[in-house]
Amino acid sequence: MKNENNNPRKSNIIGICVSQLQNHEVSGLTHTIYQCARANGYQVMVFGCFAKMDFPTPHSNGEASIFENIPMKDLKALILMGQTILHRELLLRLRDEAVAVGTPVITVDYELEKCFNIRLDYLSCFKRLVRHVIEGHHRHNPYFMAGFKGNAFSEERLDAFVEVLEENGMPVVQEHIAYGDFWGKPARRVCEQWMERTDDFPDAIICANDTMALAVIDVLEENGYHVPEDVIVTGFDGIELIKYCIPRLTTGRVDQEEIAEQIMHIVKRVETDPETAPQSVLVPFHILRGESCGCAPIHF
């Protein structure tokens, strides 16, 4: 990417724009990128805040002021943690300010034109996870707990569930699919309704994220069912909380170190050849086989 000022950039600083730093996964990834950058000889400036930016409020607007005076021309590269900010106009402004002074922009899990985009391959892993339950554990009556209706992540995972059912010649029963809105309380309500189906009980409940899966396990156990002996439960995302739950949840998780390494690879490539055209890099998710599917023995 060409430096519009035609001056060699002496700075060795990488900037990171991020929000929702109170989230353990967000702060963990930010720290992993920081450590990887330092190990590769770069300094790091983190422009971070805690508010959600997708629905602007006076409070979030105040926190967003951290992004107003970033020294773009002094940065080796700018990293936008787009899924933590979720304010498209703000992300576009930051991108344009960086590009205008020749600073390459790298996005994480949020695609923008004129940027190097680190994309996360949720779909392939989620399909493998569904196949693991149906084909690996031979479950014949799986239910699916989606997130928000219409949400891209939720609908993509629902489509994956349906696709794997059809691959295995299994019927898609709409009554076996419900929306838990990615949160614990809505997921509990849905699962409590499922508990009333004595004549059509699931032998597996596949959830679109870990938070809902943990709520489902709680409801099952409160109603006298054992996980995974009676019902297999799986989640997705690999949140920190699953480390402290019994049974340990089977889920999918991205390798944060791989994200950081891909970012460093891009930074070094652009450093060597400033005319490198922006492109996308796909980082895979991996299945973490835990206790909730029966792959690992339960330890108390």
Give the label of every model feature segment:
Residues M1-R131, E196, D200:
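Alpha-helical recognition/docking segments in bacterial nutrient-uptake
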Residues K10-S11, H138-R139, P202, P284:
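Phosphate-coordination loops involved in phosphoryl transfer and adenosine-cofactor binding
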Residues V18-G28, F47-N61, T84-L86, I118-R128, ...:
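Hinge/beta->alpha junction and helix N-cap segments in small-molecule ligand-binding domains
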Residues Q35-C36, L75-K76, R188, P297-F300:
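PLP-dependent class I/II
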Residues A39-Y42, L165-V172, R197-D200, E222-V227:
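Short helix-capping segments at alpha-helix termini
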Residues H140-N141, V172-H176, V227-I232:
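Short acidic capping loops at alpha-helix termini that bridge into adjacent secondary structure
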Residues V190-F300:
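Flexible loop/turn connectors
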